[in-house]
Amino acid sequence: MPMDADVQTHARTLALRSPDHLRVGPFTVRYNPNWSIKYANYAIPDQDAEPTRADLDALVAAFREHDRLPRLEFLPGSAPAVEPALLAAGFTVENRAPVMACAPDALLTPKPVASLTIAEPATDAEFDAAALVQHHGYGGTGEPEGGEAEWLRTAATGGGVAALATIDGVPVGAGGCSVPVDGLTELAGLAVAGAYRRRGIGAALSAHLTATAFGRDCRVVWLEPGDADVERIYAGIGFRRVGEKLNISLDPA
């Protein structure tokens, strides 16, 4: 199976395992009642899905019933008929993001960062600190929603990885690798506190998460970089492009 197909199967399987997921026609909706951010709530089409307009109307209605933006994340090659149907129904492409992956023999060690300590959160206070770094790192204000820390806890207890980076006891970075499926895990939610960026913390934290996942018998770590600069950081520790993911949504009515 090509790597991009593996990645799509991994994402779809995790969505189906999530306790609050919805099935709407040929779609699985990953719904997070405790985390309203759009990146935590999206639909994935079935392999080779060919949705009707009625299927799409039902999908939109399900999102709006749960007070979420109608949105999908998927690799277009897994269901070629879906993107044209979505565009015809008024959806707008947010972006086409590269999908990158790394195998154990490709991982490179980045330069060390002075005084940086990376460890897995163990206490509620540590998970909350990690979630706060992520929340602010992705532009949030105030306190994070409960779902942010919950995602890290689920990863840490389900065979994935969670990590909190500190410098002299101050939380400066956080991220995780999802619960694995058939040896694949997604590195996600990686964030570095604004005052500590451009010091190599992102690369160090990413390499730590990836190496730890390999140590827990994962065979591939994949991710979606946020922009070209972030992609270069991941490329510097051994990640390479394996496909492209479509992020597409319907503007509020």
How would you describe each model-predicted region?
Residues 50-125, 247-250:
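Acyl-donor-binding surface of acyltransferase catalytic domains
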